[in-house]
């Protein structure tokens, strides 16, 4: 069972915290992680790109000049792709990029992502993280205590004051535990999470 330090927001160690083997101590499956991240990024795409083909561009119904005798290359339409304002060859059209991810694969990927953070010593467990009012200085001070720059902060529930405190800090994102995903966990160098949020994760994935 992985054991990590338990800290307060000032960066002082207040004890040890045991993590579930079933969630934070599994073998990292890089293949599944890759598949899930590719699917997540694909699902974020709008797919609204659109350009006109030569059939859709207005004009160009008349041959621009006669076939022979002008000395110029033969042309059939001013809306052919080689012309300025002509149509696009194989023009992109709106499409759905979404990819379905099986629940079992999501679970394996989430456990692998969390376990990788433990193995790479990139996880920080906080005793608690509260704020009566938005105070960016407090979050900056906490990040400095853990030498954290590109950081994901995870709380048990949505906390407006914590969110407002961190939203102007470059490279820092605050999420409630219900909103975390594999991509967000892996793309940040430091994963700071409250012990109550850890308990929620273990309830779902253990």
Curated annotation (Swiss-Prot):
GO terms for molecular function: rRNA binding; structural constituent of ribosome. Pfam families: Ribosomal_L4 (PF00573). This is Large ribosomal subunit protein uL4. It comes from the Bacteria. HAMAP family: Ribosomal_uL4_B. The keyword Membrane does not apply. PANTHER family: 50S RIBOSOMAL PROTEIN L4, LARGE RIBOSOMAL SUBUNIT PROTEIN UL4M. GO terms for cellular component: ribonucleoprotein complex; ribosome. Part of the 50S ribosomal subunit. GO terms for biological process: translation. InterPro entries: Ribosomal_uL4, Ribosomal_uL4-like, Ribosomal_uL4_dom_sf. The keyword RNA-binding applies. Belongs to the universal ribosomal protein uL4 family. It comes from Clostridium tetani (strain Massachusetts / E88). Keywords: Ribonucleoprotein, Ribosomal protein, RNA-binding, rRNA-binding. Residues 44-76 are annotated as: Disordered. One of the primary rRNA binding proteins, this protein initially binds near the 5'-end of the 23S rRNA. It is important during the early stages of 50S assembly. It makes multiple contacts with different domains of the 23S rRNA in the assembled 50S subunit and ribosome. The lineage of its organism: Bacteria, Bacillati, Bacillota, Clostridia, Eubacteriales.
């Amino acid at each position: 069972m992985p054991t990590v330090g338990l800290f307060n927001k000032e960066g002082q160690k207040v004890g040890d915290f045991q993590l579930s083997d079933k969630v934070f101590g599994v073998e990292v499956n890089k293949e599944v992680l890759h598949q899930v991240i590719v699917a997540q990024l694909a699902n974020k795409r709008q797919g609204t790109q659109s350009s006109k083909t030569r059939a859709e561009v207005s004009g160009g119904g008349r041959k621009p000049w006669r076939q022979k005798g002008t000395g110029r290359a033969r042309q059939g339409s001013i809306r052919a792709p080689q012309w300025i304002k002509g149509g696009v060859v194989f023009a992109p059209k709106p499409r759905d990029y979404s990819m379905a991810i099986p629940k079992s694969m999501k679970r394996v990927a989430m456990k692998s992502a969390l376990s990788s953070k433990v193995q790479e010593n990139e996880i920080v467990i906080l005793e608690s993280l509260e704020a009566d009012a938005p105070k960016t200085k407090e979050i900056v001070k906490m990040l400095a205590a853990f030498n954290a720059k590109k950081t994901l902060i995870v709380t048990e529930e949505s906390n407006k004051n914590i969110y407002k405190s961190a939203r102007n800090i470059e490279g820092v994102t605050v999420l409630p535990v219900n909103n975390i995903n594999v991509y967000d966990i892996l793309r940040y160098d430091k994963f700071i999470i409250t012990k109550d949020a850890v308990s929620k994760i273990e309830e779902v994935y253990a």
